[in-house]
UniProtKB/Swiss-Prot annotation:
Catalytic activity: The enzyme shows specific recognition of a C-terminal tripeptide, Xaa-Yaa-Zaa, in which Xaa is preferably Ala or Leu, Yaa is preferably Ala or Tyr, and Zaa is preferably Ala, but then cleaves at a variable distance from the C-terminus. A typical cleavage is -Ala-Ala-|-Arg-Ala-Ala-Lys-Glu-Asn-Tyr-Ala-Leu-Ala-Ala
Annotated ranges, domain PDZ: 96-174
Protein name: Carboxy-terminal processing protease CtpA
GO biological process: proteolysis; signal transduction
PANTHER family on file: CARBOXY-TERMINAL PROCESSING PROTEASE CTPA, TAIL-SPECIFIC PROTEASE
InterPro entries, alphabetized: ClpP/crotonase-like_dom_sf, CtpA/B_N, PDZ, PDZ_6, PDZ_sf, Peptidase_S41A, Peptidoglycan-bd-like, PGBD-like_sf
Active site positions: S297, E308, K322
Span of the signal peptide: 1-36
PROSITE patterns: PDZ
Annotated keywords: Hydrolase, Protease, Serine protease, Signal
Keyword ATP-binding: no
GO cellular component: outer membrane-bounded periplasmic space
Record's note on what induces expression: Is expressed only during vegetative growth.
Length: 466
């Protein structure tokens, strides 16, 4: 489906998380055929005795379901693996929705790492993206409740909710400090591929995640661009948090010769399974791939495969570095255990976990692209000081205004705000709130859209290949 592309780093004025980061494989994968060693009942004598002791001796009434759920959670937590988790019925339903259909929430992929709940990437066009949420932002509180000690699904359950309702997030961003956001939840669409024809017959294709329909969406996008005369392609995987592994394999095959490696899977016994391109490649025209620190999991599989097996240049920043594979087993009551079952390796056998993939052509965005969102519901005025004032000063400076960045809302800054309001035909109050803040976010978005230095580098690189 054709649609005007939006940059993954858009800063806007509204706001509104989805699911945990995972590289998910479905039941028809050979990985699910791996057998595990059986465990004798004697191994669970201690567990059974503890259960009986709690049932008989605890001073209050107990709930069998809660005890069993707690035991499973404890076993999963003992693995010390942020990608393995136990999901109750509600959490499992939310997880399924994020890879198969639209869902309601704020639209951001999150993970638990070293006891912290972190943003992997906001989903394209989501309230989270519009709010200016960035990869690596740490979630501190949800509606005033600390997420410390929670697993990722517990945190997600707090963040998600019905369309139109709001959730308050307290985030911490490296180099900025704590940020408070009030985000309106919305329906997060399932569409994952967006394409358009750029100048010089360059087909730009943005892939936002890997869901059940992504391979078909990509094929349709390529067919459409081919009919329009595309002579080369830019695949934009920036901010893509991953998803279904088989989709990444199918999509990679479109750009890789039959018989060449796409990826490898390594099991705990050391055996490896090599996934190869099983069909003739579809795209033979020059291609480049854009990546950044929000490119993760299945997106990293595709990026690495195209580079190592088709010599496609990667452009941008070092990727996230998520190199494990999960399966999900559903139980009769609707609960699910999502478990890491293997490592995945690149086509050449490299494990990129916690390291990421370094691009061949480094390209960074302007510093102002990393500025946090300013809440339009809050008021900043003369006499105020602090981080948010400093952010506003940096934004106006990026837009060309002469601003002293000193974190102080002094008379000089009041004058600058009035200049901005006059230019944008707003009431000249010198106060930053409401429509003024909203307009500031929109104007910064426009500047970012016009100064996508990574996309410019991708176009420059592709032209040399064409």
């Amino acid at each position: 489906m054709k649609r005007q592309l939006k940059l993954f780093f858009i800063v806007l004025i509204t706001a509104v998380v989805a699911s945990a980061l995972t590289l998910f494989i479905t039941g028809n994968s050979s990985i699910l055929g791996q057998k595990s060693a059986s465990t004798g009942d004697s191994k669970f004598d201690k567990l059974n005795k503890a259960y009986e002791q709690i049932k008989s001796d605890y001073y209050q009434k107990t709930d069998d379901d809660k005890l069993v759920d707690g035991a499973i959670k404890g076993m999963i937590q003992s693995l010390d693996d942020p990608y393995s988790t136990y999901m109750d019925q509600e959490q499992a339903k939310s997880f399924d929705e994020t890879i198969s259909a639209s869902f309601e929430g704020i639209g951001a992929q999150v993970e638990e790492k070293d006891g912290e709940i972190l943003i992997v990437s906001p989903i394209k066009g989501s309230p989270a993206e519009k709010a200016g949420i960035k990869p690596r932002d740490q979630i501190i509180k949800v509606n005033g409740k600390s997420v410390k000690g929670m697993n990722v699904n517990e945190a997600v359950a707090l963040i998600r909710g019905k369309k139109g309702t709001k959730v308050k997030l307290e985030l911490n961003r490296a180099g900025v400090g704590n940020i408070d956001l009030s985000i309106k939840r919305d329906t997060i669409p399932v569409e994952t591929v967006y394409s358009e024809m750029k100048d010089n017959n360059i087909g730009e294709i943005q892939i936002t995640s890997f869901s059940e329909t992504t391979a078909k969406e990509l094929t349709d996008a390529i067919d459409s661009l081919e009919k329009k005369g595309a002579k080369g392609y830019i695949l934009d995987l920036r901010g893509n948090p991953g998803g279904l592994m088989e989709q990444a394999i199918t999509m990679s095959n479109l750009f890789i010769d039959k018989g060449k490696n796409i990826m490898q899977v390594e099991y705990k016994n050391g055996s490896k399974e090599v996934m190869k391109a099983e069909k003739e490649r579809k795209v033979t025209k020059p291609t480049v791939v854009l990546v950044n620190d929000g490119t993760a999991s299945a997106a990293e599989i595709m990026a690495a495969a195209l580079h190592e097996s088709s010599n496609v240049p990667l452009i941008g920043e070092t990727t996230f570095g998520k190199g494990t594979v999960q399966t999900a087993k559903e139980y009769d009551d609707g609960s699910t255990v999502k478990l890491t079952v293997a490592k995945w390796l690149t086509a050449d056998g490299e494990w990129i976990h916690k390291k990421g993939i370094k691009p061949q052509v480094k390209a960074e965005l302007p510093d102002y692209a990393k500025l946090p969102y300013l809440d339009a519901d809050k008021t900043y005025k003369s006499g105020d000081t602090g981080t948010n004032v400093k952010v506003a000063q940096k934004m106006l400076k990026a837009l060309g205004y002469k601003v002293k960045v000193n974190s102080m809302y002094d008379q000089d800054f009041v004058s600058v705000v009035k200049q901005f309001q006059k230019k944008e035909k707003l009431n000249e109050t010198g106060i930053l709130t409401g429509d003024t803040t909203t307009k500031l976010m929109i104007e910064l978005q426009k500047k970012l859209s016009d100064n996508d230095t990574q996309m410019e580098k991708a176009i420059e690189t592709l032209k040399k290949e064409m």
